[in-house]
């Protein structure tokens, strides 16, 4: 048994992954690290060294003074660890450390191989300390687990148990300013570590931005670093009740820290931007900044409720900016796909607004961090409590300014042994569309649509990739002949467009039944982003019959984007909700999207998140409902200013009782929707049934105007029956 007291060795604990950064910080404070273990550094120094770490360490979790080691004389499998801990506690005279009138608490940690009921063992340590006091002075101290004057930290080991005085009291990450919390906040010392790793102070930024600020931790920690504010300046510590506490030394260190902070406040600070889509987070950030003592600096901090889609012009040209944020990863957002879309959208915004600037972004999975467009990226893995996180550091790559594919395409002479007519027609179509696509920035369009009877296929351009759909040939056509002709067409497509085979995706399109639109054709899941107007949209050219973006409704979506500002928008049979997305980006007061397919609603949410819009948020600005549209219209009462309905021609989904036929059922569908339309609102109705006729009852009840020609773009002029569309309003508006 060894009861020697060593007052010149200290343990400094930290979160896993911070050991290197913490060692650098401690050595900058003038203290040498003598030993390094996982989550713990050991230093040799004076009490002043320990106090300085308490005052100035932004990264440490605790500062522990080992005061008693209880060496085990023998160990065996049946050992009673709780009783060993009691024996170790009672064998030391604790009245040498603190007075019996002080309150205390026990924090017990057992090494991995030690099997012990920590709750019971903690009680036995408490009993040992109390019994030691009774033997020494005849009085016992009281337990206070919430605000003890003394905290004892006990490490249960394999060959010895170590009893420490916790000089920090509460964990050092508790700076005392966090009065208001948000979901899944990052600990203060981890936030500081990220800022230290990113060399915030050395970069001397003119702009500091946290676009998803939560409770404001990054902003406050950045303020503390840039104003030389000691993290321990205003918090309570665990040494005030310790007999060995040097009050004069501590007060002198405190005065020194206060003086340094006041001097640093005389220097100019960057402009801070703290944004969040949640008003509660914005409020929490403001209150926490005030609680941290930075109320006088609020004029330098723009704290606003903003989504990523609502960023202002930062005027960041020729300025040094620093971006740091903790996006709502994991359970706070939902599935992994939506998380990936969030990081893709954030990356695009950074590239546009802050090219060549430094950023540090937290991710829950490394795959999320990998989509960030950073030069020379570095990754730091940390533990935020029990959650592993990955921090990606790097310089933001400049945005790649792209033009529509046709803007750079040039017609070249193409000679084909066969399929020359097809090649000529495709080239003619592309030449005719080139000027329009370039002027209007059209990235996705139809290039060919069964123009020639012998080549019964559709060729669609999505960005710089082609989606080729072969219409199933009639039974009277020899399958081998049809296959040969299709292969000839593919060769002509490659020759005319200049695209290689990897950029061409092929499907065979048969007549749709009520469910096969939703049936997976493949499991490749090769989704990518295309641009349409202001919207970035995820498309999939492999997995489903449809791609996620109906090209023939482009003009309708752009029309909705122009008309949606300030309006409440309803999208029925919303598919991937691209019309809702355009409405949202066009400034709609709210969007509501209804579709029977959970698959497509999940895709819809990814589209919204990709564009910096919040989904499933408390303010219910953008809502998604997996429901039969007939029943949904019947059950609700909310009114909408703008409604878009694009129903299928026919549906017999298992989720839908009965069948839907657009010709048979459009009257009751439109009437139900008109009951949800405001008196001055507009409903757009469209469908792809070639034989569709609007019922006279609808024309008699409402103001009805067919606008088909206005909703078909130049790329579909060759197929005027691709869809039909109407504008419907309540009577008396025109």
Curated annotation (Swiss-Prot):
This is Ribosomal RNA large subunit methyltransferase K/L. Its EC number is 2.1.1.173, 2.1.1.264. Keywords: Cytoplasm, Methyltransferase, RNA-binding, rRNA processing, S-adenosyl-L-methionine, Transferase. Specifically methylates the guanine in position 2445 (m2G2445) and the guanine in position 2069 (m7G2069) of 23S rRNA. GO terms for molecular function: 23S rRNA (guanine(2445)-N(2))-methyltransferase activity; RNA binding; rRNA (guanine-N7-)-methyltransferase activity. It is found in: Cytoplasm. SUPFAM superfamilies: S-adenosyl-L-methionine-dependent methyltransferases. GO terms for cellular component: cytoplasm. Pfam families: Methyltrans_SAM, RlmL_1st, THUMP, UPF0020. It catalyses: guanosine(2445) in 23S rRNA + S-adenosyl-L-methionine = N(2)-methylguanosine(2445) in 23S rRNA + S-adenosyl-L-homocysteine + H(+); guanosine(2069) in 23S rRNA + S-adenosyl-L-methionine = N(2)-methylguanosine(2069) in 23S rRNA + S-adenosyl-L-homocysteine + H(+). The gene is rlmL. Residues 49-167 form the THUMP domain. The keyword Signal does not apply. It comes from the Bacteria. The lineage of its organism: Bacteria, Pseudomonadati, Pseudomonadota, Gammaproteobacteria, Moraxellales. Belongs to the methyltransferase superfamily. RlmKL family. Gene3D superfamilies: 3.30.2130.30, RNA methyltransferase domain (HRMD) like (3.30.750.80), Vaccinia Virus protein VP39 (3.40.50.150). Signal peptide: none annotated. NCBIfam families: PRK11783.1 (NF008748).
């Amino acid at each position: 048994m060894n009861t020697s007291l060593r007052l010149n060795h200290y343990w400094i604990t930290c979160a896993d992954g911070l050991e290197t950064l913490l060692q650098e910080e401690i050595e900058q404070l003038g203290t040498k690290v003598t030993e390094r273990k996982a989550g713990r550094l050991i230093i040799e120094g004076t009490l002043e060294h320990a106090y300085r770490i308490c005052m100035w360490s932004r990264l440490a979790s605790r500062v522990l003074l080992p005061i008693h080691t209880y060496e085990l004389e023998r160990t065996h499998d049946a050992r009673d660890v709780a009783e060993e801990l009691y024996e170790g506690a009672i064998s030391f005279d604790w009245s040498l450390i603190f007075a019996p009138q002080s309150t205390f608490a026990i924090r017990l940690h057992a090494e991995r191989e030690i099997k012990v009921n920590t709750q019971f063992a903690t009680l036995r340590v408490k009993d040992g300390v109390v019994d030691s006091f009774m033997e020494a002075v005849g009085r016992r101290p009281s337990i206070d687990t919430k605000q003890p004057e003394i905290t004892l930290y006990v490490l249960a080991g394999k060959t010895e148990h170590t009893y420490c005085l916790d000089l920090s009291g509460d964990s050092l990450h508790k700076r005392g300013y966090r009065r208001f919390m948000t979901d899944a906040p990052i600990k203060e010392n981890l936030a500081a570590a990220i800022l230290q790793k990113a060399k915030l102070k050395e970069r001397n930024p003119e702009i500091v931005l946290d676009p998803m600020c939560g409770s404001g931790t990054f902003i406050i920690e950045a303020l503390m670093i840039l104003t030389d504010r000691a993290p321990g300046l205003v918090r309570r510590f665990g040494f005030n009740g310790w007999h060995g506490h040097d009050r004069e030394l501590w007060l002198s260190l405190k005065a020194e820290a206060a003086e340094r902070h006041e001097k640093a406040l005389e220097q100019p600070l960057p402009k801070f931007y703290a944004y969040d889509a949640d008003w509660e987070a914005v409020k929490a950030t403001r209150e926490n900044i005030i609680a941290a003592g930075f109320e006088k600096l609020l004029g330098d901090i723009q704290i606003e409720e903003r989504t990523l889609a609502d960023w202002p012009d930062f005027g960041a040209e020729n300025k040094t900016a620093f971006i740091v944020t903790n996006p709502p990863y994991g359970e706070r957002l939902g599935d992994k796909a939506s998380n990936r879309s969030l990081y893709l959208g954030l990356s695009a915004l950074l590239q546009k607004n802050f090219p060549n600037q430094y950023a540090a972004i937290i991710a829950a999975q490394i795959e999320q961090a990998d989509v960030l467009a950073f030069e020379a990226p570095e990754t730091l893995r940390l533990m935020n409590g029990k959650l592993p996180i990955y921090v990606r550091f790097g310089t933001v790559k400049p945005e790649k300014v792209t033009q529509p594919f046709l803007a750079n395409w040039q017609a070249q002479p193409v000679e084909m042994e066969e399929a020359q007519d097809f090649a000529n027609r495709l080239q003619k179509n592309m030449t005719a569309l080139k000027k329009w696509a370039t002027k209007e920035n059209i990235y996705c369009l139809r290039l060919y649509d069964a123009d020639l009877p012998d080549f019964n296929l559709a060729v669609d351009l999505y960005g710089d990739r082609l989606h080729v759909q072969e219409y199933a040939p009639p039974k009277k056509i020899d399958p081998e002949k049809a296959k040969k002709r299709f292969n000839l067409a593919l060769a002509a497509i490659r020759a005319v467009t200049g695209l290689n085979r990897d950029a061409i995706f092929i499907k065979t399109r048969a007549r749709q039944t009520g469910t096969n639109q939703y049936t997976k054709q493949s499991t490749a899941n090769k989704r990518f982003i295309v641009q349409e107007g202001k919207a970035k949209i995820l498309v999939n050219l492999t997995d489903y019959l449809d791609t996620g973006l109906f090209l023939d409704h482009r003009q309708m979506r752009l029309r909705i984007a122009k008309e949606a500002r300030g309006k409440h928008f309803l999208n029925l049979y919303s598919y991937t909700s691209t019309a809702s997305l355009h409405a949202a980006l066009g400034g709609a007061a709210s969007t509501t999207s209804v579709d029977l397919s959970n698959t497509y609603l999940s895709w819809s949410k990814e589209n919204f998140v990709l564009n910096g819009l919040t989904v499933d948020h408390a303010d219910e600005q953008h809502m998604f409902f997996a429901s039969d549209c007939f029943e949904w219209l019947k059950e609700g009462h909310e009114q909408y200013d703008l409604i878009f309905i694009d129903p299928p021609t026919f549906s017999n989904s298992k989720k839908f009782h009965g069948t839907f036929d657009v010709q048979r059922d459009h009257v009751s569908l439109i009437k139900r929707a008109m009951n949800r339309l405001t008196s001055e609102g507009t409903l757009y109705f469209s469908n792809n049934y070639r034989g569709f006729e609007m019922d006279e009852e609808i024309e008699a009840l409402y103001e009805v105007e067919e606008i088909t020609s206005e909703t078909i773009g130049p790329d579909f002029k060759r197929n005027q029956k691709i869809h039909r569309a109407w504008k419907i309003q309540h009577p008396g508006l025109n």
